[in-house]
Amino acid sequence: PEHPEDWVINYGYFITPSDVDISLDLMKQYGVKPEFECFAMTDLHYVRRLINKGWTDPTGGPNWVSFVYTTGSNWNLPEFMDMLKQVCPRNTLLNIIATGTQQFPILTEALIHGFNVRVGMEDNVYLGKGKKADSNAQLVEKVMQIAKLIERPIANCEQARAMLGLGAPRKFEWKD
């Protein structure tokens, strides 16, 4: 296609409550830490219900919840992020993901509010208006510069694993 936006496939994604139960049971069985991705407040309330009915993270660490701001979202950021802090389930580490042209302003607001952020080409391919990134590293570097400007500490790998309650990396063994 002539324009990158023509490459996007218009589709929907859904997961049923029984799919969630099966997935969570398998994660518990294998000690996998789930990431709950929320696209709306109703998703966050659903995660809270799962936690309140007794589902706990098999790693023993905090629940990892990502809230996704998509292109076209029109929330008033400071007030909305304040509300996220109030409605987040207990024992939760909140991560903000933003897509499209407003990624860096949204992630900056998230950092100011004390949230963790995700950045990468899965979510956005631009460093700024009309300037494409050549790599994920460029996007990470930009968000690191923003964090440094607002004096927000940046976790290294070991610190991030500790925050998530993951402990030391496990060695993968292929089983037939």
Where are these regions (language model features)?
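A short, flexible beta-alpha/helix-coil linker loop
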Residues: 124-126
